[in-house]
From Swiss-Prot:
Locus of motif RxLR-dEER: 50-64
Function according to Swiss-Prot or TrEMBL: Secreted effector that completely suppresses the host cell death induced by cell death-inducing proteins.
Protein name: Secreted RxLR effector protein 126
Family membership noted in the UniProt record: Belongs to the RxLR effector family.
Predominant location category: secreted
Compartment(s): Secreted; Host membrane
Key words of the record: Host membrane, Membrane, Secreted, Signal, Virulence
Domain notes: The RxLR-dEER motif acts to carry the protein into the host cell cytoplasm through binding to cell surface phosphatidylinositol-3-phosphate.
Signal peptide: 1-20
Gene Ontology annotations for the cellular component aspect, listed alphabetically: extracellular region; host cell membrane; membrane
Length: 193
């Protein structure tokens, strides 16, 4: 029991030192994608993010694994900071300025998480609706294309039918004319004798 406090203090310092270093690195990555500090580490960070994202069947990017992992990491870091702060407060090592700074940090952390969630939801909503509009336009275009091709086929068929009927009528008229001419010349021969 008497070693429990020492173990807790040691664990708190191990967690807090690990979380403070990783918090600085993550903040640099998130805040400065193109700066010289985060440029060396940023590609692996974003590659990991892309690897954890999955593509849905309809083309929407569904971020399944990454937000859960990111949220878990954020909660672990915040838990470490809370534990470190509580340990310092327990031993009376926190000044009023330090308390205010920690409360401001907690508020900023909540605000950042809320903004990230809101950004993801808005992005997903826009992707979903834009994709829906895109699919509707594509379907409309294919329907119009099919209607135009059907109309063209009907027009071709009607044109061929009208050409055939006109040809048959002309042929019949010519045959009638030939028969009349033959009859006329037969009658003329009869009258000639």
């Amino acid at each position: 029991m008497r070693y429990l406090l020492a173990v807790l203090i040691a664990a708190a310092f191990v967690i807090s030192s690990g979380t403070s270093v990783s918090t600085i690195a993550d903040d640099e990555l998130i805040l400065s994608k193109d700066t010289t500090i985060g440029a060396a580490v940023a590609p692996t960070f974003h590659d990991d993010k892309r690897m954890l994202q999955t593509k849905a069947v309809n083309g929407l990017e569904e971020e399944r694994g990454w937000p859960l992992l990111e949220t878990g990491i954020g909660k672990i870091k915040m838990g470490g900071k809370k534990f470190k702060h509580a340990t310092k407060r327990m031993f009376g090592m926190v000044s009023p300025a330090g308390e205010a700074k920690f409360e401001a940090y907690k508020g900023l952390h909540k605000l950042k998480r809320g903004l990230i969630r809101m950004y993801r939801r808005v992005k997903w909503w826009f992707q979903k609706n834009i994709l829906r509009q895109k699919h509707a336009l594509e379907e409309g275009a294919t329907r119009a294309k099919h209607k135009v091709s059907e109309a063209n086929q009907k027009l071709k068929h009607r044109t061929k039918e009208s050409e055939k009927t006109a040809y048959h009528r002309l042929k019949e008229a010519f045959q009638k004319f030939r028969h009349r001419m033959k009859d006329f010349f037969k009658k003329m021969r009869v009258y000639a004798y």
